[in-house]
């Protein structure tokens, strides 16, 4: 057994013996000529480069085989900035270069070796760090490992044979200045002829005299590095050290080295080395790279001599220090000395002597021999080579030590603040003032201003708190009331927040506390902090936490919302996505434990609880949002009691809580997904909560079996809203191609066939996920939750994904939510209008409907407080505005004040979004890529009150500028130069206007005058600008001006620049473009910007639109708009014509009253009823051109005549004459549906007719004429499908049996009246002139979707027949059709039911002895000779106005049976009563008791110009009462009644036999007292008017109903949806469930080790379950005891122990939890049991019966009191 040990020792000794010399012969001096060239360029466009070329001599003296001394002599460099036709490595004649000396120290340095491999470099302490790194770059070329000292075990390894020459292939972990990474070695013998013909590669072929020539190739893999210096900010979270260079990332790096050696692989001489390092930049906005930085370093052996003199004496040796291995090192840029952060010497991977010791010391550098991956997670958190100490990070008053960026190391490796030659503070002040002046003067080019702002922001980032104060004092010397002072403040304010440093935050905090910023300005500023901060250290966050708790925040409007949200976002960014920040530069910025984050979350949770205690809905919403934004698992336990109904909250707030869990679900879908699923599965929960939950659950990518369950359940779920949300979400995801949803999309395709085929209207809850084929915008995410009291959604969220997505969140997010639209409408209506007259009238005389509600004693339901929010979030900032009724009152009051007084609204702001990555190149200088997206917005609008008060005038100025800077290159610290290549894009839009408005309410006229707000001068003013400028440059870092002003800047022009100009009036468009061929002006103007927006087109282009300012006076725009409405009734009825008169000569003048009257006459001719609406608009530039443009449009719908008419008139006139006229009139004769008569509907094919006349020319009467006639009808295929459908056959069978089903026949009647075919015939006098357009229209129809649209045309008869995939559904209340998808013939049986659901409108039908409610509840009813209320509105407790019903909804419908097997129906509209009855075989009408004869065409009742209602006789003889004012339609045939009510007005706002119209059929039997009855006859009797001569069963049933059990309306019932495990607690639930509780607890204990399963949160420490129960109790001071509760004469005990705090501890946090109680009568026995329990006994009550349930506040954890 001792043999292996002895052998190992012998091998160790053998290795220690210097049996070979590797590359260096002791006492020899080697001289290598050094050549370095580094260039950058946008070479995808043109091979134009900027950079430097260096040369010098590296002299190496070999002191021993483990020690070299070196010196770099005669270092020189030259600038290169030119086109190199053969690429970056082209040869440049020396005479064309102007060399300068590099200011190096020239001091010698030492190189330590081990087995021929460089281990450490030692330099004089005073040598600048930039020089050290450059020398490391040069010396690193001599790093060669021919013996596999650092080899990695790999299957591809080929070990060299003992015979010479031999080849080898292996991988090694090798360090260079660019990092310690995996290197692929390929060693091959070099042919002899190459050595003879390539003196550049083998300059001394005779040295040594024996051996062979070898070529050593090295390929560096930057994806597998153990050590790499890197600074990045704003990049995708996946861009870490290990994978930053992977393909398709922003930056990819390649390094290859060719070395030629002579000798053997054990003893050789390095003849030459050539290293090429290429860094390619591919911004996320590009499909291909835009450019590359190239670097080549060559070392060529020049001499080999014996050492003649020594460079180091004792003094020099005492001053040297180790700088570690070859990896780039950093210094303190703010220190006068170097203060280098020194790395460790390189460790040999395979040295037996050292592996046992050194690798243990530095285990994070170890590399698994079984894997080629070199990633190390520990280095990510605790990297020993981080560039800044933790102590400096804690001082938020200090400027950050940001490595590798120009302003921090550009001055000889120091911050530019250290320069003695430049007063950098003064440069900053000058730059700030320049920006302030430029944004004041509109004539300046703002593209330069934005670049100056970026430079200022970057410069301020290098400052400490004292320097910030100096800048503040400088700005304060300007009067803030002046424009210059105001602009200087805006510039400083925004630059400070975008600096994102500790001193910047302290400055902002001081502004807030001193009142320098407040209100909305302060709120906006705080919202930008988490978007801009670069170093959110724990102390930074602590300081922010103190701020949000201070009174200056909590008691200041807007700020008290913005600050907690900004803090929450900062928590998320720091703790959830920490690698977004430069953790590889500063180390992990978050705390290892969770103590602090727990403290922060607890504060937010406490504030939420405080909001509930204060009943402050704004505060509640704010902290729901804030908790959600943190995306921390702890928020689950915070929301738990509210979501489970243990603490009171509104359904709106529960919906927000579910929405707030979305960010967490994206990070830990397996944790949050089950919670969403359980919320969705609770059918007793509000549909708003369920819709939100299921949409977000689907996005968590659940298991296939669960997704199948969700899809299948849409066939059984009673909520159409929830089913709509499921179906729309799945259908959208099916079509998405986003990589992150690929797996989910495949699952959705698999389950789509299980989904209910029913299609849902647009206003149902929906989820849409849309992809964009665009290089910028990637997709759109939309979530909508429908409202119960309006067509508009209650909740809307829209997220826009783009290349600028920030921390996994969409680039832009907008949304809103409101608890009740009806409350909003009532409140705004109350505030905007005076109710005094109406209330006085209501007090003196209540309406019929209000009296009815009083008589029935209808109780209004308890309304929740009005609440809502508006949301906006982007990469620049965010805004969340929660509101309640008080905020709406304030907003309306502010708007009134704004419109009735002189006011000004103004905003000036800079915004910026940036991404940065920087790392050392193999040359030893930093590579830098920066992406900047600055935006400047300046907007101002003035309101000036005029006479009369309806007149206004003012100024509207808007300036929007944006800039995209994509720049890459390198820094040369020794000469303060930044070598840059890049592409800049600029966009500017300016709108300077003056306006005057006048509103004439009496004449219904609105007049607007607009003219440019530009001073008259002889110069032109820019309005828009767009440019793309690729360039190369060399810029001095002290030059803070734009690179376009730099003399060294050269645009990258690929061909001759084409210049074009197009002028139109005062406007001029100028184009400069770099194109490969000459293009037309029109093409450049129209397509130039769109082409340039393509990521592959980065060519030079400029497009400018200018305005000639001397023509300002001529550019006044006048717009005049007049609106009119005329009601058609008997008094103004026009002469009767069966058809619309299409031929009429109209007055052509602007704002012509005669023309409007003539159009009214044309539209109303022959109609019995209707309201004609006319809009007249004229547009002119009277001082610039003579032409005036007139647009007039009119329309009317006549319910009585069943006609819809339109009239369009357009003319161009000048100099009192018409130049061009167009007139189009159209009439549609539509057929009324017969909702109560199926036989008529199925036997009479529905058909609508259309006739349109288009005239155009000099005048309408003398020009061309086109006549279009058409119709809409059922195609034979659709007709056949309907007649043979199961629903139609079933209805026919039931009618024949005399058992007509209301539900079945209603659907069959509705579907029998849809249309799907359009027929058109065109008759034109000049047909040949329109033939081309005609064919284009047909082609468009076919092109749109040939597989769906069946388009047939007959050119000879000019006929078009279109059968489309949609059917037109006639509506009873709306002016035109709804649309539904038509099933194909192959789907007729499976899909016809879907069509039935789509065409059916919500209605209530009273049949012979049944009622079908609005919510589709069918039940038996017997009215008898007693009035029953079918439908009535009732007071909604609107703002405490008792018994008040808005005038527009004072509606009731009553019915009773009569003797002749018929019914009387009473329709109440306001104070009008319409009685419908059957007398003999005729239907009669009485209005307010007066009989009214209904003419054949119907009857109309109006009040002035307002139609109250109309009565129309339908084709089957039934009567239809239509009231568009009240939004209700009643259809009556003498026996049956069908009601249609406007959902926006009456949904969830009615009572009666028709139900409450809330989309739930289970609560339709709701009595006036808000009780639910089970027996329909008793329910119906509660709405019987028993006090009005009531005969029938109603009185007795009403008596029974009053004695029946009152079942309260079931509120939404919450259930336990969050388990202890999901809430992060030890599992205490289910103690009595099953037979294996102990095993289950054990299993849970094992699982709890994983906590929430998310390493980012360090949940292992925070999970309260620990590994077992005892650990939990010990850690959180928890003890379990049986609780005793005394209730009257009972003593109750909890059946399971309840957690409590140990003695001398107090609860840190509590949550409510329900426990079962076992109760005993109070006696001696129970009192004794109580005493023993209180003394600590633990009797087993688990098998005892449960008598009561009680809530206990149980502690989650306890701490010392």
From Swiss-Prot:
In the UniProt record, does the keyword Secreted occur? Answer: yes
UniProt keyword annotations, A-Z: Disulfide bond, Glycoprotein, Secreted, Signal, Storage protein
Q: Where is this region: Disordered?
A: 336-386, 1627-1675
Q: Does the keyword rRNA-binding apply?
A: no
Residues covered by the Vitellogenin domain:
24-796
Query: Which part of the chain is the VWFD domain?
Result: 1402-1591
Q: Which PROSITE patterns match?
A: VITELLOGENIN (PS51211), VWFD (PS51233)
User: Where are the disulfide bridges?
Assistant: 181-225, 1404-1554, 1426-1590
Signal peptide bounds: 1-16
- InterPro entries found in the cross-reference section: Lipid_transp_b-sht_shell, Lipovitellin_superhlx_dom, Vitellinogen_b-sht_N, Vitellinogen_open_b-sht, Vitellogenin/Apolipophorin, Vitellogenin_N, VWF_type-D
Indicate, by first and last residue, each region the UniProt record lists as having compositional bias (Low complexity): 366-378
Q: Which GO terms describe its molecular function?
A: lipid transporter activity; nutrient reservoir activity
Where is there biased composition of kind Polar residues? 345-356
Top-rank lineage group of the source organism: Eukaryota
SUPFAM superfamilies from the UniProt entry: Lipovitellin-phosvitin complex, beta-sheet shell regions, Lipovitellin-phosvitin complex, superhelical domain
Q: Where in the cell is it found?
A: Secreted
Checking Pfam families in the record gives:
Vit_open_b-sht, Vitellogenin_N, VWD
Assign the protein's first listed, main location to one coarse class.
secreted
Q: Which residues are glycosylated?
A: 383, 560, 615, 1284, 1342, 1345, 1460, 1668, 1724
GO-annotated cellular components: extracellular region
The function of this protein is:
Precursor of the egg-yolk proteins that are sources of nutrients during embryonic development.
Q: Which PANTHER family match?
A: VITELLOGENIN 1-RELATED (PTHR23345:SF15), VITELLOGENIN-RELATED (PTHR23345)
Put simply, this protein is called Vitellogenin-3
């Amino acid at each position: 057994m001792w043999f292996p040990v002895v052998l190992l020792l012998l091998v160790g000794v053998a290795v220690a013996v210097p049996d070979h010399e590797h590359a260096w012969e002791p006492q020899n001096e080697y001289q290598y000529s050094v050549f370095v060239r580094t260039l950058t360029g946008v070479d995808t466009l043109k091979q134009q480069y900027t950079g430097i070329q260096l040369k010098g001599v590296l002299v190496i003296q070999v002191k021993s085989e483990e020690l070299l001394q070196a010196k770099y002599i005669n270092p020189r460099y030259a600038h290169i900035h030119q086109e190199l036709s053969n690429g970056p490595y082209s040869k440049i004649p020396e005479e064309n270069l102007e060399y300068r000396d590099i200011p190096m120290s020239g001091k010698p340095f030492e190189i330590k070796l081990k087995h021929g491999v460089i281990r450490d470099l030692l330099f004089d302490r005073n040598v600048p760090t930039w020089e050290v790194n450059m020398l490391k770059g040069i010396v690193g070329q001599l790093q060669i490992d021919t013996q596999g000292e650092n080899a990695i075990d790999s299957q591809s390894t080929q070990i060299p044979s003992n015979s010479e020459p031999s080849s080898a292939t292996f991988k090694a972990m090798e360090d260079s200045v660019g990092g310690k990474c995996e290197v692929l070695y390929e060693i091959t013998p070099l042919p002899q002829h190459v050595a003879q013909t390539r003196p550049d590669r083998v300059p001394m072929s005779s040295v040594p005299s024996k051996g062979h020539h070898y070529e050593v190739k090295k390929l560096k893999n930057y994806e597998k590095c153990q050590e790499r210096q890197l600074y990045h900010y704003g990049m995708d979270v996946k861009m870490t050290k290990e994978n930053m260079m992977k393909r398709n990332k922003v930056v990819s790096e390649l390094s290859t080295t060719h070395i030629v050696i002579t000798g053997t692989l054990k003893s050789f001489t390095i003849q030459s080395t050539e290293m090429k390092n290429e860094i390619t930049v591919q911004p996320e906005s590009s499909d291909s790279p835009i450019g590359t930085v190239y670097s080549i370093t060559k070392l060529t052996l020049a001499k080999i001599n014996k050492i003649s003199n020594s460079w180091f004496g004792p003094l020099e040796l005492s001053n040297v220090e180790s700088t570690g291995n070859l990896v780039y090192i950093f210094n303190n840029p703010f220190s006068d000395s170097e203060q280098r952060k020194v790395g460790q010497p390189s460790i040999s991977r395979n040295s037996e002597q050292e592996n046992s010791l050194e690798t243990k010391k530095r285990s994070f550098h170890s590399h698994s021999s079984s894997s080629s991956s070199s990633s190390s997670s520990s280095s990510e958190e605790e990297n020993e080579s981080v560039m800044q100490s933790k102590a400096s990070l804690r001082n938020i008053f200090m400027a950050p030590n940001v490595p590798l960026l120009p302003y921090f190391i550009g001055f000889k490796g120091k911050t530019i603040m250290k320069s003695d030659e430049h007063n950098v503070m003064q440069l900053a002040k000058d730059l700030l003032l320049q920006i302030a002046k430029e944004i004041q003067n509109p004539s300046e080019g703002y593209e330069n201003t934005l670049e100056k702002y970026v430079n200022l922001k970057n410069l301020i980032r290098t400052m400490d708190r004292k320097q910030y104060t100096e800048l503040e004092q400088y700005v304060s010397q300007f009067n803030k009331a002046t424009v210059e002072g105001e602009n200087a403040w805006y510039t400083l304010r925004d630059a400070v927040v975008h600096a994102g440093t500790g001193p910047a935050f302290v400055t902002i905090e001081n502004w807030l506390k001193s009142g320098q910023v407040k209100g909305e300005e302060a709120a906006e500023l705080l919202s930008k902090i988490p978007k801009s901060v670069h170093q959110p250290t724990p102390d930074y966050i602590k300081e922010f936490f103190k701020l949000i708790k201070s009174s200056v925040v909590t008691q200041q409007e807007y700020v008290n919302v913005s600050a907690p949200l900004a803090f929450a976002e900062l928590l998320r960014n720091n703790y959830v996505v920490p690698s977004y920040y430069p953790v590889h530069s500063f180390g992990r910025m978050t705390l290892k434990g969770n103590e602090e984050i727990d403290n922060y979350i607890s504060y937010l949770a406490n504030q939420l609880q405080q909001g509930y205690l204060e009943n402050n809905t704004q505060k509640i919403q704010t902290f729901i949002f804030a908790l959600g934004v943190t995306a921390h698992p702890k928020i689950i336990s915070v929301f738990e009691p509210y979501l489970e109904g243990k603490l009171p909250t509104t359904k709106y707030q529960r919906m927000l809580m579910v929405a707030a869990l979305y960010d967490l679900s994206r990070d830990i879908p397996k944790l949050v997904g089950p919670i969403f699923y359980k919320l969705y599965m609770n059918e007793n929960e509000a549909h708003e909560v369920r819709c939100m939950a299921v949409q977000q659950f689907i996005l968590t990518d659940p298991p296939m079996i669960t997704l199948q369950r969700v899809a299948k359940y849409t066939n059984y779920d009673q909520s159409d809203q929830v089913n709509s949300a499921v179906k729309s979400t799945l259908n959208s995801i099916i079509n998405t191609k986003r990589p992150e949803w690929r797996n989910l999309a495949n699952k959705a395709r698999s389950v789509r066939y299980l989904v209910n085929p029913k299609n849902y209207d647009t206003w149902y809850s929906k989820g849409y996920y849309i992809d964009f084929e665009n290089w910028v915008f990637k997709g759109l995410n939309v979530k909508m939750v429908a409202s119960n009291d309006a067509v508009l959604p209650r909740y809307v969220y829209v997220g826009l994904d783009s290349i600028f997505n920030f921390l996994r969140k969409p680039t832009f997010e907008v949304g809103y939510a409101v608890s009740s639209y009806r409350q909003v409408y009532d409140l705004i209506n109350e505030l905007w209008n005076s109710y005094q007259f109406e209330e006085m009238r209501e007090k003196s005389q209540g309406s019929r409907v209000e009296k009815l509600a009083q008589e029935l004693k209808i109780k209004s339901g308890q309304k929740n407080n009005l609440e809502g929010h508006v949301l906006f979030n982007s990469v620049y900032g965010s805004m969340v505005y929660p509101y309640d009724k008080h905020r709406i009152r304030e907003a309306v009051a502010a708007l009134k004040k704004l419109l009735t007084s002189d006011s000004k609204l103004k905003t000036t702001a800079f915004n910026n979004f940036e991404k940065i990555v920087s790392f050392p190149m193999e040359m030893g200088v930093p590579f830098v890529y920066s992406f900047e997206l600055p935006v400047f917005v300046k907007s101002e609008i003035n309101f000036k009150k005029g006479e009369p008060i309806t007149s206004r005038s003012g100024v509207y100025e808007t300036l929007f500028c944006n800039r995209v800077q994509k720049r890459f290159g390198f820094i040369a610290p020794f000469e303060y130069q930044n070598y840059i290549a890049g592409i800049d894009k600029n966009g500017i839009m300016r709108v300077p206007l003056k306006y005057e408005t006048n509103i004439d309410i009496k004449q219904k006229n609105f007049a607007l005058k607009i003219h440019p707000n530009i001073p008259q001068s002889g110069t032109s003013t820019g309005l828009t600008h767009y440019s793309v400028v690729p360039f190369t440059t060399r810029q001095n870092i002290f030059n803070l001006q734009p690179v376009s002003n730099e003399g060294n800047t050269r645009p990258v022009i690929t061909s001759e620049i084409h210049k074009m100009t197009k002028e139109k009036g005062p406007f001029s468009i100028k184009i400069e473009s770099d194109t490969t061929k000459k293009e037309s002006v029109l093409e450049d103007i129209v397509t130039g910007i769109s082409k340039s927006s393509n990521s592959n087109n980065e060519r030079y282009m400029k497009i400018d639109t200018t305005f000639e300012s001397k023509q300002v006076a001529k550019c006044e725009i006048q717009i005049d708009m007049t609106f009119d409405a005329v009601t058609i009734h008997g008094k103004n009825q026009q002469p009767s014509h069966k058809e619309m008169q299409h031929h009429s000569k109209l007055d052509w003048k602007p704002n012509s009253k005669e023309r409007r009257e003539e159009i009214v006459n044309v539209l109303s001719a022959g109609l019995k009823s209707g309201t004609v609406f006319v809009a007249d608009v004229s547009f002119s530039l009277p001082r610039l051109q003579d032409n005036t443009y007139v647009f007039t449009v009119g329309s009317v719908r006549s319910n009585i005549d069943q006609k819809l008419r339109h009239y369009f008139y357009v003319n161009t006139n000048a100099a009192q004459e018409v130049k061009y006229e167009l007139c189009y009139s159209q009439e549609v004769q539509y057929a009324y549906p017969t909702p109560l008569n199926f036989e008529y509907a199925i036997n009479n094919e529905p058909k609508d007719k259309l006739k349109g006349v288009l005239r155009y020319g000099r005048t309408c009467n003398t020009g061309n004429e086109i006549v279009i006639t058409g119709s809409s009808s059922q195609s034979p295929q659709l007709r056949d499908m309907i007649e043979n459908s199961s629903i139609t056959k079933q209805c026919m069978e039931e009618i024949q049996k005399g058992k007509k089903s209301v539900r079945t026949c209603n659907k069959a009647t509705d579907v029998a009246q849809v249309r799907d075919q359009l027929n058109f015939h065109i008759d034109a006098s000049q047909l040949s002139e329109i033939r081309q357009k005609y064919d284009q229209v047909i082609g468009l129809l076919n092109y749109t979707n040939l597989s769906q649209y069946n388009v047939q045309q007959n050119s000879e008869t000019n006929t078009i027949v279109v059968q489309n995939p949609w059917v037109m559904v006639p509506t009873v209340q709306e002016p035109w059709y709804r649309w539904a998808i038509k099933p194909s013939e192959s789907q007729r049986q499976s899909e016809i039911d879907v069509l039935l659901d789509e065409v059916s409108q919500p209605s209530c039908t009273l049949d012979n002895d049944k009622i079908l409610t609005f919510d589709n509840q069918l039940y038996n009813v017997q009215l008898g000779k007693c009035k029953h209320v079918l439908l009535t509105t009732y007071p909604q407790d609107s703002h405490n106005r008792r018994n008040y019903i808005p005038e527009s909804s004072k509606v009731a419908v009553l019915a009773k049976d009569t003797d002749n097997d018929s019914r009387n129906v009473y329709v109440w509209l306001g104070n009008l009563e319409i009685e419908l009855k059957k007398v003999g075989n005729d239907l009669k009408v009485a209005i307010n008791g007066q009989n009214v004869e209904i003419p054949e065409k119907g009857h109309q009742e109006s009040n002035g110009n307002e139609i109250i209602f109309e009565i129309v006789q339908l084709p089957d003889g039934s009567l239809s009462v239509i009231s568009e004012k009240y939004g209700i339609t009643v259809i009556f045939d003498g026996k049956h009644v069908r009601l249609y009510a406007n959902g926006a007005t009456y949904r969830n706002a009615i009572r009666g036999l028709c139900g409450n119209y809330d989309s739930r059929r289970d609560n339709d039997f709701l009595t006036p007292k808000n009780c639910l009855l089970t027996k329909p006859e008793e329910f119906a009797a509660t709405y019987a008017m028993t006090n009005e001569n009531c005969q029938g069963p109603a009185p007795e049933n009403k008596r029974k109903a009053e004695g029946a059990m009152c079942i309260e309306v079931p509120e939404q019932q919450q259930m336990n949806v969050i388990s202890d495990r999901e809430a992060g607690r030890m599992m205490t639930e289910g103690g009595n469930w099953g037979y294996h509780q102990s095993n289950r607890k054990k299993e849970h204990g094992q699982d709890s080790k994983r906590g929430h399963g998310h390493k980012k949160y360090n949940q292992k420490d925070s999970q309260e379950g620990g590994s077992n129960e005892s650990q939990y109790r010990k850690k959180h001071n928890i003890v379990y005891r049986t609780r005793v509760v005394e209730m009257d004469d009972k003593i109750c005990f909890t059946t399971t122990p309840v957690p409590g705090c140990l003695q001398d501890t107090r609860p840190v946090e509590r949550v409510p939890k329900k426990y079962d109680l076992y109760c005993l009568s109070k006696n001696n026995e129970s009192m004794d049991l109580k005493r023993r329990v209180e003394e600590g006994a633990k009797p087993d009550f688990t098998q005892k019966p449960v008598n009561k349930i009680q809530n206990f506040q149980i502690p989650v954890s306890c701490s010392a009191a």
